Amino acid sequence: EALADPIADPVAGPNPEADPEAINLKAIAAFAKKLLG
């Protein structure tokens, strides 16, 4: 988790036991949606 992208942290949500890779994918998707509108 310490190596994760800082941008992913607030997007990951309150479930620290979730798959880190899945969280990262969701974070990237959410960030992309914010960038693309």
UniProtKB/Swiss-Prot annotation:
Maturation-removed propeptide residues: 1-22
Statement: the UniProt record of this protein carries the keyword Secreted: yes
Chain positions of AXPX repeats: 4-7, 8-11, 12-15, 18-21
InterPro entries: Mastoparan
One GO process term, biological-process aspect: defense response to bacterium
Pfam (any one): Mastoparan
Tissue expression pattern: Expressed by the venom gland.
Function statement: Antimicrobial peptide with potent activity against both Gram-positive (S.aureus MIC=50 ug/ml, and B.subtilis MIC=25 ug/ml) and Gram-negative bacteria (P.aeruginosa MIC=25 ug/ml, E.coli MIC=3-50 ug/ml, K.pneumoniae MIC=25 ug/ml). Exhibits little hemolytic activity on human erythrocytes.
Similarity comment: Belongs to the MCD family. Mastoparan subfamily.
Protein name: Mastoparan-VT
